[in-house]
Amino acid sequence: MHRTTIPLIVAVLTVSVALRCMGQDTESLPAREAKAASIDELLLFFPSKFPDGEWKPKDLQFQDVFFVAEDETKLHGWYCPANAPRAVVLVAHGNAGHVASRAPWLRFLQTKAKVSVFMFDYRGYGRSEGTPTVEGALRDAKAARAKLCELAAIKDTEMLLMGESLGGAIVIQLAADSPPRGLILQSTFSSLRDVADVHYPKLSWLVPGNKLDSATQIVRYRGPLLQSHGNVDRTIPFSSGEKLFRSANEPKQFVTIEHADHNNWVTDAYLNQLDRFLARVSEAQK
């Protein structure tokens, strides 16, 4: 999750409080102003757009994939098939950047982890059209999952779901609706309200309690889980990750990444655990 999220949240929520105190309903504001007070669109999403970034990375074999969400929003992602893959993985990234900014991670998954991977951009990110919202991101993920079924010629229950930070909350919803072969979460929160309680407790009541309530949704998923979190994460508290993990069903594994903040969780120790998890899930499928 983008580090500047927190001060931005405080600023916009303060405006929201002021409007309520003055008796002005944000629903009555013009569309542009109402969006300016939208927690979903301005406080959670920090998209980067094409052509910013390196869109022709070296040593990564990928296909540009264009597809549409249920509401006809045009979306884009990179499909990176591996030779003789041991698994197929759908990846939902965090709330900043785009697929091109994750090229090194995609390269690792394809060449080292030996999995075929499809990473998509939420609406408003990269080459995907539209404006990002929570509801839209969930629709986008659902459409991406269906597209990966087509690309890899598999059922949705045969793929693994992987999510980083915000992306973890997105794939938890997918897993709750239709269980995948396995679920991999990195630096993911228990709920948006819980994060708000830590960073701005006096204003956290403005965040709906059911907004990305992953701890409640993950109860509906029954299958293998690998969850990891840096123990000095200053963006999503380590305790939030622990709370999410406690809510999950077995079989599950929690990996504490020592001395890791929110974005530097890719360590040799974690990659070793990821490799073992992929091996177990792949073997169980045979």
Q: Where do the protein language model's features map onto the residues?
A:
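Membrane-embedded segments
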Residues: 70-147
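Alpha/beta-hydrolase fold nucleophile elbow
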Residues: 154-165
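C-terminal catalytic histidine-bearing segment of alpha/beta-hydrolase fold enzymes
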Residues: 242-286
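Acidic catalytic loop of the alpha/beta-hydrolase fold
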Residues: 231-236, 263-264
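Hydrolase active-site cap/lid region
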Residues: 168-223, 267
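Short beta-strand/loop motif that positions the catalytic acidic residue
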Residues: 220-222, 227-229, 233
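Short alpha-helix in the alpha/beta-hydrolase fold that links the catalytic acid
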Residues: 105, 214, 223, 237-246
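An N-terminal hydrophobic leader/cap segment in hydrolases
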Residues: 21-66
